[in-house]
Amino acid sequence: MSDFWHKLGCCVVEKPQPKKKRKRIDRSMIGEPMNFVHLTHVGSGDMGAGDGLPMAGTVQQQMRSKCGRDRQWSNSRVL
């Protein structure tokens, strides 16, 4: 009887799921931006001296003044 279960176990094997092929996106599928709000420009004058990073306080202050909200902008990605 154990031989039967051994042979049955060899036949019942979990097969790997085939990878789903992602649909390719072309330019005709992409439309104009919706609900776009332009807050500010960040140019070379807004960059920190020598470090190549924007001065966070200045950029955040510009964004607050442009959108008219008193929202506290954070540096984290979690909103």
UniProtKB/Swiss-Prot annotation:
A Gene Ontology BP annotation from the UniProt entry: regulation of cell shape
Gene Ontology cellular component list: cytoplasm; cytoskeleton; plasma membrane
Gene Ontology MF term list: small GTPase binding
Primary subcellular site in the record, as a coarse category: cytoplasm
Keywords: Cell membrane, Cell shape, Cytoplasm, Cytoskeleton, Lipoprotein, Membrane, Palmitate
Membrane topology of the entry: Lipid-anchor
Pfam short name (any one): PBD
Keyword Signal found: no
CRIB domain location: 30-43
Compartments it resides in: Cytoplasm, Cytoskeleton; Cell membrane
Keyword check for Cytoplasm: yes
PROSITE patterns, alphabetized: CRIB
Lipidation positions, renumbered (S-palmitoyl cysteine): 10-11
Family: Belongs to the CDC42SE/SPEC family.
Role description: Probably involved in the organization of the actin cytoskeleton by acting downstream of CDC42, inducing actin filament assembly.
Name the UniProt record assigns to this protein: CDC42 small effector protein 1-A
